[in-house]
Amino acid sequence: MVIIRLARGGSKKRPFYNIVATDSRNRRDGRFIERVGFYNPVATKGEALRIAQDRLTYWQGVGAQLSPTVQRLVKEAQKAQPAA
């Protein structure tokens, strides 16, 4: 099953997450099919969250499931989008 979840990057104490579409059997930071966005929780200026909505819609259309954290981030991105 394909799942859209966070893959951790960055250094110690400075997390950075890629939002990726991957097979659910792969490791958290392992092989993925496609990167659909990123989330930087420690960003002070600049962009902290970007999601390619067209690719997210595509993956959901072919049956991909969102992890609970990605669901929360998608809602956050949709709230911020009309204001921008």
UniProtKB/Swiss-Prot annotation:
SUPFAM superfamilies: Ribosomal protein S16. GO terms for molecular function: structural constituent of ribosome. InterPro entries: Ribosomal_bS16, Ribosomal_bS16_dom_sf. Signal peptide: none annotated. Pfam families: Ribosomal_S16. The keyword Ribosomal protein applies. One of its GO terms (biological process) is translation. Transmembrane segments: none annotated. The keyword Ribosomal protein applies. Keywords: Ribonucleoprotein, Ribosomal protein. GO terms for cellular component: cytoplasm; small ribosomal subunit. PANTHER family: 30S RIBOSOMAL PROTEIN S16, SMALL RIBOSOMAL SUBUNIT PROTEIN BS16M. HAMAP family: Ribosomal_bS16. Belongs to the bacterial ribosomal protein bS16 family. This is Small ribosomal subunit protein bS16. It comes from Burkholderia multivorans (strain ATCC 17616 / 249). The lineage of its organism: Bacteria, Pseudomonadati, Pseudomonadota, Betaproteobacteria, Burkholderiales. The gene is rpsP.
